[in-house]
UniProtKB/Swiss-Prot annotation:
CDD domains noted in UniProt: Anticodon_Ia_Arg, ArgRS_core
GO molecular function: arginine-tRNA ligase activity; ATP binding
Protein name per Swiss-Prot or TrEMBL: Arginine--tRNA ligase
Organism: Streptococcus thermophilus (strain ATCC BAA-491 / LMD-9)
Reactions catalysed: tRNA(Arg) + L-arginine + ATP = L-arginyl-tRNA(Arg) + AMP + diphosphate
Gene: argS
Keyword tags: Aminoacyl-tRNA synthetase, ATP-binding, Cytoplasm, Ligase, Nucleotide-binding, Protein biosynthesis
EC number: 6.1.1.19
GO cellular component, one term: cytoplasm
Residue ranges crossing the lipid bilayer per the database entry: none
Protein backbone atom coordinates (compact mmCIF):
# COMPACT_ATOMS: atom_id res chain seq x y z
CA UNK A 1 0.00 0.00 0.00
CA UNK A 2 1.48 3.39 -0.96
CA UNK A 3 1.23 6.54 1.15
CA UNK A 4 -1.83 7.95 -0.61
CA UNK A 5 -3.69 4.64 -0.27
CA UNK A 6 -2.80 4.47 3.43
CA UNK A 7 -4.06 8.03 4.09
CA UNK A 8 -7.22 7.46 2.01
CA UNK A 9 -7.96 4.24 3.94
CA UNK A 10 -7.64 6.04 7.31
CA UNK A 11 -9.82 9.00 6.23
CA UNK A 12 -12.45 6.60 4.77
CA UNK A 13 -12.78 4.95 8.21
CA UNK A 14 -13.77 8.34 9.66
CA UNK A 15 -15.83 9.53 6.65
CA UNK A 16 -17.61 6.49 5.12
CA UNK A 17 -19.62 8.89 2.91
CA UNK A 18 -16.61 9.18 0.57
CA UNK A 19 -15.15 6.37 -1.55
CA UNK A 20 -11.50 5.61 -0.85
CA UNK A 21 -10.61 6.27 -4.50
CA UNK A 22 -12.28 9.72 -4.37
CA UNK A 23 -10.30 10.59 -1.24
CA UNK A 24 -7.08 9.55 -2.98
CA UNK A 25 -7.88 11.77 -5.97
CA UNK A 26 -8.57 14.76 -3.67
CA UNK A 27 -5.24 14.55 -1.80
CA UNK A 28 -2.91 17.45 -2.57
CA UNK A 29 0.78 18.16 -2.06
CA UNK A 30 1.00 21.43 -0.07
CA UNK A 31 3.07 24.23 -1.59
CA UNK A 32 4.85 24.75 1.72
CA UNK A 33 6.60 21.82 3.49
CA UNK A 34 5.52 23.34 6.85
CA UNK A 35 1.95 22.39 5.90
CA UNK A 36 2.73 18.67 5.77
CA UNK A 37 3.51 16.11 3.08
CA UNK A 38 -0.08 15.68 1.92
CA UNK A 39 -3.29 17.60 2.56
CA UNK A 40 -6.96 16.67 2.28
CA UNK A 41 -9.40 19.54 1.52
CA UNK A 42 -12.75 19.12 3.31
CA UNK A 43 -14.79 21.33 0.91
CA UNK A 44 -16.32 18.36 -0.96
CA UNK A 45 -17.82 17.06 2.30
CA UNK A 46 -19.58 20.32 3.26
CA UNK A 47 -22.76 19.52 1.28
CA UNK A 48 -22.88 15.86 2.31
CA UNK A 49 -22.28 16.46 6.03
CA UNK A 50 -24.00 19.90 6.15
CA UNK A 51 -21.16 21.42 8.12
CA UNK A 52 -18.55 24.08 7.50
CA UNK A 53 -15.35 22.66 5.93
CA UNK A 54 -13.29 23.99 8.90
CA UNK A 55 -15.41 21.98 11.37
CA UNK A 56 -15.22 18.85 9.20
CA UNK A 57 -11.40 19.17 8.98
CA UNK A 58 -11.12 19.54 12.78
CA UNK A 59 -13.39 16.49 13.32
CA UNK A 60 -11.42 14.26 10.94
CA UNK A 61 -8.05 15.37 12.36
CA UNK A 62 -9.26 14.50 15.85
CA UNK A 63 -10.71 11.07 14.98
CA UNK A 64 -8.17 9.75 12.47
CA UNK A 65 -5.76 7.02 13.63
CA UNK A 66 -2.49 8.96 13.51
CA UNK A 67 -0.24 6.07 14.60
CA UNK A 68 0.98 5.60 11.01
CA UNK A 69 1.90 9.28 10.66
CA UNK A 70 4.23 11.74 12.38
CA UNK A 71 1.26 14.03 13.04
CA UNK A 72 -2.14 15.05 11.66
CA UNK A 73 -3.50 18.57 12.13
CA UNK A 74 -6.40 20.67 10.87
CA UNK A 75 -5.56 24.08 9.44
CA UNK A 76 -8.71 25.87 8.27
CA UNK A 77 -10.56 23.60 5.82
CA UNK A 78 -7.52 21.32 5.30
CA UNK A 79 -6.30 18.21 7.12
CA UNK A 80 -2.51 18.34 6.90
CA UNK A 81 -0.71 15.02 7.19
CA UNK A 82 2.95 14.78 8.16
CA UNK A 83 4.36 11.39 7.22
CA UNK A 84 6.59 9.34 9.48
CA UNK A 85 9.60 9.37 7.15
CA UNK A 86 11.67 6.97 9.27
CA UNK A 87 8.88 4.38 9.33
CA UNK A 88 8.03 4.70 5.62
CA UNK A 89 11.69 4.56 4.56
CA UNK A 90 12.18 1.42 6.68
CA UNK A 91 9.11 -0.20 5.06
CA UNK A 92 10.08 0.73 1.49
CA UNK A 93 13.76 -0.22 1.81
CA UNK A 94 12.78 -3.46 3.52
CA UNK A 95 10.41 -4.37 0.67
CA UNK A 96 12.88 -3.57 -2.13
CA UNK A 97 15.75 -5.42 -0.41
CA UNK A 98 13.59 -8.49 0.34
CA UNK A 99 11.97 -8.68 -3.11
CA UNK A 100 14.85 -7.53 -5.31
CA UNK A 101 13.93 -7.37 -9.00
CA UNK A 102 10.47 -8.77 -8.07
CA UNK A 103 9.62 -5.57 -6.17
CA UNK A 104 6.38 -4.19 -7.70
CA UNK A 105 5.46 -7.57 -9.26
CA UNK A 106 1.69 -8.05 -9.34
CA UNK A 107 -0.85 -10.69 -10.28
CA UNK A 108 -3.48 -8.54 -12.00
CA UNK A 109 -3.13 -10.65 -15.17
CA UNK A 110 -3.47 -14.02 -13.46
CA UNK A 111 -1.46 -15.69 -16.25
CA UNK A 112 -3.82 -14.60 -19.06
CA UNK A 113 -2.41 -13.93 -22.54
CA UNK A 114 -1.98 -10.52 -24.16
CA UNK A 115 -1.20 -10.72 -27.89
CA UNK A 116 1.08 -8.03 -29.32
CA UNK A 117 1.08 -7.37 -33.07
CA UNK A 118 4.46 -5.68 -33.49
CA UNK A 119 7.50 -4.80 -35.60
CA UNK A 120 6.19 -6.27 -38.92
CA UNK A 121 8.97 -5.30 -41.35
CA UNK A 122 8.55 -6.04 -45.06
CA UNK A 123 10.52 -8.96 -46.46
CA UNK A 124 13.30 -7.88 -48.84
CA UNK A 125 13.25 -4.30 -47.56
CA UNK A 126 15.74 -2.85 -45.07
CA UNK A 127 14.85 -2.51 -41.39
CA UNK A 128 14.59 1.21 -40.74
CA UNK A 129 14.21 3.41 -37.67
CA UNK A 130 10.49 3.58 -38.56
CA UNK A 131 10.12 -0.15 -37.72
CA UNK A 132 12.07 0.41 -34.51
CA UNK A 133 9.22 2.32 -32.83
CA UNK A 134 6.71 -0.52 -33.16
CA UNK A 135 9.35 -3.03 -32.03
CA UNK A 136 10.59 -1.26 -28.89
CA UNK A 137 7.24 0.21 -27.75
CA UNK A 138 5.55 -3.21 -27.99
CA UNK A 139 8.49 -5.03 -26.39
CA UNK A 140 8.48 -2.60 -23.43
CA UNK A 141 4.69 -2.92 -23.02
CA UNK A 142 5.04 -6.71 -23.14
CA UNK A 143 7.62 -6.55 -20.32
CA UNK A 144 5.37 -4.20 -18.32
CA UNK A 145 2.27 -6.42 -18.59
CA UNK A 146 4.40 -9.48 -17.70
CA UNK A 147 5.30 -7.68 -14.46
CA UNK A 148 1.55 -7.38 -13.83
CA UNK A 149 1.14 -11.14 -14.13
CA UNK A 150 -0.01 -11.37 -17.77
CA UNK A 151 1.67 -13.62 -20.33
CA UNK A 152 2.69 -11.55 -23.36
CA UNK A 153 2.64 -13.20 -26.81
CA UNK A 154 4.89 -11.28 -29.21
CA UNK A 155 3.72 -11.70 -32.82
CA UNK A 156 5.85 -10.38 -35.68
CA UNK A 157 3.23 -9.97 -38.44
CA UNK A 158 5.75 -9.99 -41.30
CA UNK A 159 4.99 -8.23 -44.58
CA UNK A 160 5.73 -11.41 -46.55
CA UNK A 161 3.06 -11.39 -49.29
CA UNK A 162 1.95 -9.17 -52.14
CA UNK A 163 2.60 -8.20 -55.75
CA UNK A 164 6.11 -6.99 -54.92
CA UNK A 165 7.14 -10.66 -54.84
CA UNK A 166 6.16 -10.99 -58.50
CA UNK A 167 8.51 -8.07 -59.22
CA UNK A 168 11.29 -9.63 -57.14
CA UNK A 169 11.02 -12.98 -58.90
CA UNK A 170 11.25 -11.30 -62.32
CA UNK A 171 14.26 -9.24 -61.18
CA UNK A 172 16.04 -12.23 -59.64
CA UNK A 173 15.53 -14.37 -62.75
CA UNK A 174 16.93 -11.54 -64.90
CA UNK A 175 19.92 -10.38 -62.87
CA UNK A 176 20.06 -12.22 -59.55
CA UNK A 177 22.93 -14.14 -58.03
CA UNK A 178 22.39 -16.70 -55.27
CA UNK A 179 25.82 -15.89 -53.85
CA UNK A 180 25.12 -12.13 -53.68
CA UNK A 181 21.73 -12.63 -52.00
CA UNK A 182 23.20 -15.00 -49.40
CA UNK A 183 26.06 -12.57 -48.66
CA UNK A 184 23.78 -9.56 -48.09
CA UNK A 185 20.11 -10.55 -48.43
CA UNK A 186 18.22 -7.33 -47.72
CA UNK A 187 20.56 -5.02 -49.60
CA UNK A 188 20.79 -7.29 -52.66
CA UNK A 189 17.03 -7.89 -52.84
CA UNK A 190 16.37 -4.16 -52.40
CA UNK A 191 18.76 -3.33 -55.28
CA UNK A 192 16.95 -5.87 -57.48
CA UNK A 193 13.57 -4.43 -56.47
CA UNK A 194 14.61 -0.83 -57.19
CA UNK A 195 16.14 -1.85 -60.54
CA UNK A 196 13.05 -3.80 -61.72
CA UNK A 197 10.73 -0.92 -60.71
CA UNK A 198 12.84 1.50 -62.74
CA UNK A 199 12.62 -0.86 -65.75
CA UNK A 200 8.84 -1.27 -65.28
CA UNK A 201 8.41 2.50 -65.65
CA UNK A 202 10.03 2.29 -69.10
CA UNK A 203 8.53 -1.06 -70.15
CA UNK A 204 4.89 -1.91 -69.21
CA UNK A 205 5.42 -5.60 -70.11
CA UNK A 206 7.55 -5.97 -66.94
CA UNK A 207 4.46 -5.25 -64.83
CA UNK A 208 2.48 -7.90 -66.69
CA UNK A 209 5.29 -10.44 -66.24
CA UNK A 210 5.41 -9.65 -62.50
CA UNK A 211 1.62 -10.04 -62.21
CA UNK A 212 1.90 -13.41 -63.94
CA UNK A 213 4.56 -14.59 -61.47
CA UNK A 214 2.46 -13.43 -58.52
CA UNK A 215 -0.53 -15.33 -59.95
CA UNK A 216 1.71 -18.42 -60.13
CA UNK A 217 2.78 -17.83 -56.53
CA UNK A 218 -0.85 -17.58 -55.39
CA UNK A 219 -1.64 -20.80 -57.29
CA UNK A 220 1.20 -22.63 -55.49
CA UNK A 221 3.57 -22.93 -58.49
CA UNK A 222 6.67 -24.86 -57.36
CA UNK A 223 9.36 -22.50 -58.70
CA UNK A 224 7.57 -19.32 -57.57
CA UNK A 225 6.94 -20.76 -54.09
CA UNK A 226 10.55 -21.93 -53.71
CA UNK A 227 11.91 -18.47 -54.63
CA UNK A 228 9.41 -16.70 -52.34
CA UNK A 229 10.33 -19.01 -49.43
CA UNK A 230 14.03 -18.44 -50.04
CA UNK A 231 13.65 -14.62 -50.15
CA UNK A 232 11.68 -14.84 -46.88
CA UNK A 233 14.18 -17.15 -45.16
CA UNK A 234 17.23 -15.09 -46.16
CA UNK A 235 15.54 -11.84 -45.06
CA UNK A 236 14.59 -13.39 -41.73
CA UNK A 237 18.20 -14.42 -41.06
CA UNK A 238 19.20 -10.77 -41.39
CA UNK A 239 16.22 -9.45 -39.40
CA UNK A 240 16.98 -11.91 -36.60
CA UNK A 241 20.54 -10.66 -36.40
CA UNK A 242 19.15 -7.16 -35.83
CA UNK A 243 16.57 -8.40 -33.31
CA UNK A 244 19.41 -10.12 -31.42
CA UNK A 245 21.28 -6.81 -31.33
CA UNK A 246 18.14 -5.14 -29.94
CA UNK A 247 17.55 -7.97 -27.45
CA UNK A 248 14.03 -8.61 -28.80
CA UNK A 249 12.52 -12.04 -29.51
CA UNK A 250 9.15 -13.25 -30.78
CA UNK A 251 6.73 -16.09 -30.09
CA UNK A 252 5.42 -16.11 -33.66
CA UNK A 253 6.57 -14.96 -37.10
CA UNK A 254 3.20 -15.70 -38.72
CA UNK A 255 3.01 -12.97 -41.33
CA UNK A 256 0.58 -12.08 -44.09
CA UNK A 257 1.22 -15.27 -46.09
CA UNK A 258 0.24 -17.48 -43.14
CA UNK A 259 -3.38 -16.33 -43.51
CA UNK A 260 -3.71 -17.08 -47.25
CA UNK A 261 -5.78 -20.21 -46.58
CA UNK A 262 -7.73 -18.65 -43.70
CA UNK A 263 -9.48 -15.78 -45.51
CA UNK A 264 -12.19 -17.85 -47.22
CA UNK A 265 -13.66 -18.62 -43.80
CA UNK A 266 -13.98 -14.88 -43.09
CA UNK A 267 -15.80 -14.29 -46.39
CA UNK A 268 -18.06 -17.32 -45.69
CA UNK A 269 -19.02 -16.01 -42.21
CA UNK A 270 -19.71 -12.52 -43.59
CA UNK A 271 -21.86 -14.05 -46.39
CA UNK A 272 -23.70 -16.35 -43.96
CA UNK A 273 -24.55 -13.42 -41.69
CA UNK A 274 -25.73 -11.33 -44.65
CA UNK A 275 -23.17 -8.62 -43.96
CA UNK A 276 -21.65 -8.36 -47.45
CA UNK A 277 -23.05 -5.79 -49.86
CA UNK A 278 -22.08 -5.14 -53.46
CA UNK A 279 -20.55 -1.77 -54.31
CA UNK A 280 -19.24 -1.14 -57.84
CA UNK A 281 -18.60 -4.87 -58.25
CA UNK A 282 -16.71 -5.14 -54.94
CA UNK A 283 -17.90 -6.81 -51.71
CA UNK A 284 -18.10 -4.44 -48.72
CA UNK A 285 -19.41 -4.28 -45.13
CA UNK A 286 -21.36 -1.12 -44.28
CA UNK A 287 -20.22 0.37 -40.95
CA UNK A 288 -22.24 3.61 -40.81
CA UNK A 289 -23.95 2.59 -37.56
CA UNK A 290 -20.48 2.71 -35.92
CA UNK A 291 -19.96 6.25 -37.21
CA UNK A 292 -17.52 4.97 -39.85
CA UNK A 293 -18.22 6.67 -43.17
CA UNK A 294 -16.30 4.37 -45.51
CA UNK A 295 -17.40 0.73 -45.79
CA UNK A 296 -14.83 -2.05 -45.21
CA UNK A 297 -13.68 -3.37 -48.58
CA UNK A 298 -13.51 -7.18 -48.23
CA UNK A 299 -13.17 -8.35 -51.85
CA UNK A 300 -12.27 -6.39 -54.96
CA UNK A 301 -14.28 -6.73 -58.17
CA UNK A 302 -11.68 -9.20 -59.53
CA UNK A 303 -12.26 -11.44 -56.49
CA UNK A 304 -8.96 -10.55 -54.79
CA UNK A 305 -9.14 -10.26 -51.01
CA UNK A 306 -7.79 -7.22 -49.21
CA UNK A 307 -5.61 -6.26 -46.27
CA UNK A 308 -8.58 -6.05 -43.87
CA UNK A 309 -9.76 -9.56 -44.84
CA UNK A 310 -6.32 -10.87 -43.88
CA UNK A 311 -6.41 -8.97 -40.56
CA UNK A 312 -9.87 -10.38 -39.81
CA UNK A 313 -8.52 -13.90 -40.41
CA UNK A 314 -5.52 -13.11 -38.18
CA UNK A 315 -7.76 -11.83 -35.35
CA UNK A 316 -9.89 -15.01 -35.46
CA UNK A 317 -6.82 -17.25 -35.53
CA UNK A 318 -5.18 -15.41 -32.61
CA UNK A 319 -8.32 -15.52 -30.46
CA UNK A 320 -8.65 -19.28 -31.06
CA UNK A 321 -4.94 -19.97 -30.57
CA UNK A 322 -4.13 -17.70 -27.62
CA UNK A 323 -7.57 -16.89 -26.16
CA UNK A 324 -6.17 -13.44 -25.43
CA UNK A 325 -7.45 -11.20 -22.63
CA UNK A 326 -6.28 -8.28 -24.79
CA UNK A 327 -4.89 -7.93 -28.31
CA UNK A 328 -2.62 -4.93 -28.79
CA UNK A 329 -1.71 -3.67 -32.27
CA UNK A 330 1.38 -1.46 -32.03
CA UNK A 331 1.17 0.19 -35.43
CA UNK A 332 1.68 3.76 -36.69
CA UNK A 333 -0.94 6.45 -36.22
CA UNK A 334 -1.75 6.52 -39.95
CA UNK A 335 -3.47 3.09 -39.61
CA UNK A 336 -6.10 4.25 -37.10
CA UNK A 337 -9.01 4.22 -39.62
CA UNK A 338 -8.11 0.65 -40.63
CA UNK A 339 -8.22 -0.60 -37.02
CA UNK A 340 -11.55 1.14 -36.36
CA UNK A 341 -12.95 -0.74 -39.36
CA UNK A 342 -11.37 -4.02 -38.22
CA UNK A 343 -12.98 -3.85 -34.76
CA UNK A 344 -16.35 -2.78 -36.18
CA UNK A 345 -16.48 -5.66 -38.71
CA UNK A 346 -15.63 -8.19 -35.96
CA UNK A 347 -18.39 -6.65 -33.82
CA UNK A 348 -20.84 -7.04 -36.74
CA UNK A 349 -19.76 -10.69 -37.04
CA UNK A 350 -20.88 -11.13 -33.41
CA UNK A 351 -17.44 -11.27 -31.81
CA UNK A 352 -17.74 -9.12 -28.69
CA UNK A 353 -14.13 -9.92 -27.80
CA UNK A 354 -13.25 -7.27 -30.39
CA UNK A 355 -13.72 -4.86 -27.44
CA UNK A 356 -10.49 -6.34 -26.04
CA UNK A 357 -8.53 -5.19 -29.12
CA UNK A 358 -6.62 -1.91 -28.95
CA UNK A 359 -4.69 -0.01 -31.58
CA UNK A 360 -1.67 1.47 -29.79
CA UNK A 361 -0.65 4.16 -32.25
CA UNK A 362 2.54 6.20 -32.30
CA UNK A 363 3.93 9.30 -33.99
CA UNK A 364 6.53 9.51 -36.74
CA UNK A 365 10.29 9.68 -36.52
CA UNK A 366 11.62 12.52 -38.67
CA UNK A 367 15.11 13.57 -39.74
CA UNK A 368 15.84 17.29 -39.82
CA UNK A 369 12.07 17.78 -39.55
CA UNK A 370 11.37 15.74 -42.71
CA UNK A 371 9.36 12.51 -42.96
CA UNK A 372 11.46 9.42 -43.65
CA UNK A 373 10.88 7.60 -46.95
CA UNK A 374 12.70 4.55 -48.38
CA UNK A 375 11.53 5.50 -51.87
CA UNK A 376 12.98 9.02 -51.65
CA UNK A 377 16.20 7.81 -50.05
CA UNK A 378 15.50 9.82 -46.86
CA UNK A 379 15.82 6.78 -44.62
CA UNK A 380 17.75 5.89 -41.45
CA UNK A 381 18.75 2.23 -41.53
CA UNK A 382 18.96 0.54 -38.17
CA UNK A 383 22.11 -1.56 -38.62
CA UNK A 384 24.57 1.27 -39.43
CA UNK A 385 22.83 3.46 -36.81
CA UNK A 386 23.46 0.87 -34.07
CA UNK A 387 27.10 0.53 -35.17
CA UNK A 388 27.58 4.32 -35.02
CA UNK A 389 25.86 4.59 -31.59
CA UNK A 390 28.10 1.82 -30.21
CA UNK A 391 31.22 3.55 -31.60
CA UNK A 392 30.24 6.84 -29.96
CA UNK A 393 29.48 5.13 -26.66
CA UNK A 394 32.85 3.37 -26.81
CA UNK A 395 34.67 6.68 -27.43
CA UNK A 396 33.03 8.22 -24.34
CA UNK A 397 33.79 5.14 -22.22
CA UNK A 398 37.45 5.21 -23.38
CA UNK A 399 37.68 8.86 -22.31
CA UNK A 400 36.01 8.32 -18.91
CA UNK A 401 37.35 4.89 -17.97
CA UNK A 402 40.17 3.64 -20.27
CA UNK A 403 41.00 0.60 -18.10
CA UNK A 404 37.44 -0.72 -17.99
CA UNK A 405 37.21 -4.48 -18.69
CA UNK A 406 34.61 -5.70 -21.27
CA UNK A 407 34.57 -2.28 -22.95
CA UNK A 408 33.04 -3.63 -26.18
CA UNK A 409 30.11 -5.36 -24.44
CA UNK A 410 29.43 -2.29 -22.28
CA UNK A 411 29.64 0.05 -25.29
CA UNK A 412 27.11 -2.18 -27.07
CA UNK A 413 24.73 -2.06 -24.07
CA UNK A 414 25.08 1.73 -23.89
CA UNK A 415 24.79 2.38 -27.66
CA UNK A 416 21.77 0.15 -28.23
CA UNK A 417 20.21 1.26 -24.93
CA UNK A 418 20.64 4.91 -25.96
CA UNK A 419 18.64 4.44 -29.18
CA UNK A 420 15.85 2.46 -27.46
CA UNK A 421 15.61 4.74 -24.42
CA UNK A 422 15.40 7.93 -26.53
CA UNK A 423 12.49 6.45 -28.46
CA UNK A 424 10.73 5.21 -25.32
CA UNK A 425 11.07 8.39 -23.25
CA UNK A 426 9.00 10.21 -25.91
CA UNK A 427 5.22 10.11 -25.36
CA UNK A 428 4.33 7.56 -28.02
CA UNK A 429 1.75 9.76 -29.78
CA UNK A 430 4.44 12.38 -30.30
CA UNK A 431 7.03 11.83 -32.96
CA UNK A 432 10.65 12.85 -32.50
CA UNK A 433 13.46 14.12 -34.66
CA UNK A 434 16.28 11.62 -34.95
CA UNK A 435 19.43 12.99 -33.30
CA UNK A 436 22.19 10.47 -32.54
CA UNK A 437 24.30 13.04 -30.65
CA UNK A 438 21.44 13.70 -28.21
CA UNK A 439 20.69 9.98 -27.85
CA UNK A 440 24.21 8.89 -26.90
CA UNK A 441 24.94 11.82 -24.57
CA UNK A 442 25.78 10.98 -20.95
CA UNK A 443 24.15 14.27 -19.91
CA UNK A 444 20.46 15.17 -19.90
CA UNK A 445 17.42 12.90 -20.04
CA UNK A 446 19.06 9.97 -21.84
CA UNK A 447 19.60 6.24 -21.49
CA UNK A 448 23.35 6.59 -20.82
CA UNK A 449 22.59 9.12 -18.03
CA UNK A 450 20.34 6.57 -16.26
CA UNK A 451 22.78 3.71 -16.93
CA UNK A 452 25.65 5.80 -15.53
CA UNK A 453 23.68 6.53 -12.32
CA UNK A 454 23.21 2.76 -11.87
CA UNK A 455 26.92 2.05 -12.53
CA UNK A 456 27.92 4.81 -10.08
CA UNK A 457 25.82 3.19 -7.33
CA UNK A 458 27.36 -0.21 -8.03
CA UNK A 459 30.80 1.38 -7.69
CA UNK A 460 29.83 2.82 -4.25
CA UNK A 461 28.52 -0.59 -3.12
CA UNK A 462 31.74 -2.30 -4.27
CA UNK A 463 33.90 0.26 -2.43
CA UNK A 464 31.86 -0.25 0.75
CA UNK A 465 31.73 -4.03 0.23
CA UNK A 466 28.07 -3.71 1.23
CA UNK A 467 25.33 -6.32 0.95
CA UNK A 468 22.12 -5.51 2.83
CA UNK A 469 20.89 -7.86 5.51
CA UNK A 470 17.31 -9.16 5.33
CA UNK A 471 17.07 -8.93 9.13
CA UNK A 472 18.29 -5.35 9.55
CA UNK A 473 16.04 -2.28 9.67
CA UNK A 474 17.27 0.61 7.55
CA UNK A 475 15.64 4.01 7.91
CA UNK A 476 16.37 7.62 6.96
CA UNK A 477 14.51 10.90 7.37
CA UNK A 478 16.63 13.57 5.64
CA UNK A 479 15.17 15.62 2.76
CA UNK A 480 17.36 14.20 -0.06
CA UNK A 481 16.79 10.54 0.84
CA UNK A 482 13.04 11.21 1.22
CA UNK A 483 12.84 12.28 -2.44
CA UNK A 484 14.27 8.88 -3.44
CA UNK A 485 12.06 6.93 -1.00
CA UNK A 486 8.91 8.55 -2.45
CA UNK A 487 9.95 7.50 -5.95
CA UNK A 488 10.78 3.93 -4.91
CA UNK A 489 7.42 3.67 -3.16
CA UNK A 490 5.67 4.91 -6.32
CA UNK A 491 7.16 2.25 -8.64
CA UNK A 492 4.16 -0.18 -8.49
CA UNK A 493 1.78 2.67 -9.39
CA UNK A 494 4.08 3.76 -12.24
CA UNK A 495 3.89 0.26 -13.76
CA UNK A 496 0.08 0.25 -13.59
CA UNK A 497 -0.15 3.72 -15.14
CA UNK A 498 2.21 2.72 -17.97
CA UNK A 499 0.11 -0.40 -18.64
CA UNK A 500 -3.29 1.34 -18.39
CA UNK A 501 -2.19 4.05 -20.84
CA UNK A 502 -0.06 1.77 -23.07
CA UNK A 503 2.67 4.32 -22.43
CA UNK A 504 6.26 3.10 -21.78
CA UNK A 505 7.42 6.74 -21.53
CA UNK A 506 5.92 6.78 -18.00
CA UNK A 507 8.53 4.19 -16.95
CA UNK A 508 11.33 5.98 -18.85
CA UNK A 509 10.50 9.32 -17.20
CA UNK A 510 10.36 7.60 -13.81
CA UNK A 511 13.86 6.17 -14.41
CA UNK A 512 15.15 9.66 -15.29
CA UNK A 513 13.57 11.15 -12.12
CA UNK A 514 15.07 8.40 -9.95
CA UNK A 515 18.54 8.85 -11.49
CA UNK A 516 18.29 12.63 -11.00
CA UNK A 517 17.15 12.23 -7.37
CA UNK A 518 20.06 9.87 -6.69
CA UNK A 519 22.62 12.21 -8.30
CA UNK A 520 21.31 15.05 -6.13
CA UNK A 521 21.58 12.80 -3.05
CA UNK A 522 25.13 11.80 -4.05
CA UNK A 523 26.13 15.48 -4.36
CA UNK A 524 24.70 16.37 -0.91
CA UNK A 525 25.55 13.30 1.16
CA UNK A 526 28.83 11.76 2.24
CA UNK A 527 27.55 8.22 1.80
CA UNK A 528 30.71 6.33 2.78
CA UNK A 529 31.64 8.40 5.84
CA UNK A 530 31.47 6.53 9.15
CA UNK A 531 28.19 7.52 10.84
CA UNK A 532 25.15 5.83 12.42
CA UNK A 533 23.30 6.31 9.08
CA UNK A 534 26.04 4.73 6.89
CA UNK A 535 24.36 1.33 6.47
CA UNK A 536 20.96 2.92 5.86
CA UNK A 537 22.48 5.20 3.22
CA UNK A 538 24.10 2.20 1.54
CA UNK A 539 20.79 0.32 1.74
CA UNK A 540 19.16 3.29 -0.02
CA UNK A 541 21.85 3.06 -2.72
CA UNK A 542 21.22 -0.68 -3.08
CA UNK A 543 17.43 -0.22 -3.36
CA UNK A 544 17.84 2.62 -5.89
CA UNK A 545 20.13 0.49 -8.08
CA UNK A 546 17.67 -2.44 -7.87
CA UNK A 547 14.72 -0.33 -9.04
CA UNK A 548 16.74 1.56 -11.69
CA UNK A 549 17.92 -1.75 -13.16
CA UNK A 550 14.37 -3.14 -13.17
CA UNK A 551 12.92 0.02 -14.78
CA UNK A 552 15.58 -0.21 -17.51
CA UNK A 553 14.88 -3.94 -17.97
CA UNK A 554 11.19 -3.18 -18.54
CA UNK A 555 12.28 -0.82 -21.33
CA UNK A 556 14.54 -3.50 -22.82
CA UNK A 557 17.70 -1.61 -21.81
CA UNK A 558 20.67 -3.19 -20.02
CA UNK A 559 22.13 -1.72 -16.82
CA UNK A 560 25.92 -2.32 -16.78
CA UNK A 561 27.57 -2.50 -13.34
CA UNK A 562 30.56 -0.53 -14.64
CA UNK A 563 30.85 2.21 -17.25
Amino acid sequence: MNTKELIAAEIAKVVPELEQENIQNLLEIPKNADMGDLAFPAFSLAKVLRKAPQMIAADIAEKIDASNFEKVEAVGPYINIFLDKSKISADVLGQVIAQGSHYADQNIGNGRNIAFDMSSPNIAKPFSIGHLRSTVIADALANIVAKQGYKPVRINHLGDWGKQFGMLIVAYKKWGSEEAVKANPINELLQLYVRINAEAEEDPSVDEEAREWFRKLEAGDEEATALWQWFRDESLVEFNRLYDELGVSFDSYNGEAFYNDKMDEVVDILTEKGLLQESQGAQVVNLEKYGIEHPALIKKSDGATLYITRDLAAALYRKRTYDFAKAIYVVGNEQSAHFKQLKAVLKEMGYNWSDDMTHVAFGLVTKNGKKLSTRKGNVILLEPTIAEAVNRAQAQIEAKNPNLPNKEAIAHAVGVGAIKFYDLKTDRMNGYDFDLDAMVSFEGETGPYVQYAHARIQSILRKADFTPSADATYSLNDVESWEIIKLLQDFPRIINRASDNFEPSIVAKFAISLAQAFNKYYAHTRILDESPERDSRLALCYATATVLKEALRLLGVEAPDEM
